[in-house]
Amino acid sequence: MQDFPRIPLAVLSTPIQKLENISRLLNTNVYIKRDDLTGIGPGGNKVRKLEFLLADAKRKGAEVVFTTGGAQSNHAMLTAACAKKLGMEPILILKKRGVTERKGNQLLEYLMDTDVRFMDTDSYDDIYAEMDRVGKAFAGLVKMAREGQFKPTNNVLYLYSGSAGGLFAIDIELN
């Protein structure tokens, strides 16, 4: 892992804590890794992957991060928090199903002034198609920029949902 670019975002390492009550109830030792103490939003293990993904994006010049998830996605909220901490602009394209009012992660995204867009679908394929559409529109702007018809202001990183870690980036290198 030392060979990969990383920007420390989390307070690490987080403790492992014995859960006394459930250990007693189950008559066995039960422990929990306290990744709620990473120091970013409500925490979670996703901050660890974002340290690498966003470091790579910053190295490549990305200024905007797209990602997706459910209406209350921890991945999306933590991506927004980490991106904001690094001076990047997060854009979340979320499923409209579920809690979409300002509760939980939606409230945190609102407080961070995050650009949140809802799609009325249960299908990630539909959301990825929308991300692809936006990406192709962006690629059209890249072509126009290369032809001297348009000067882009941002590089964009598209970060797919959840813990899968799938990633693709559009890098622009213009003279």
Enumerate the predicted regions with their spans.
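PLP-dependent amino-acid enzyme catalytic core
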Residues: 1-175
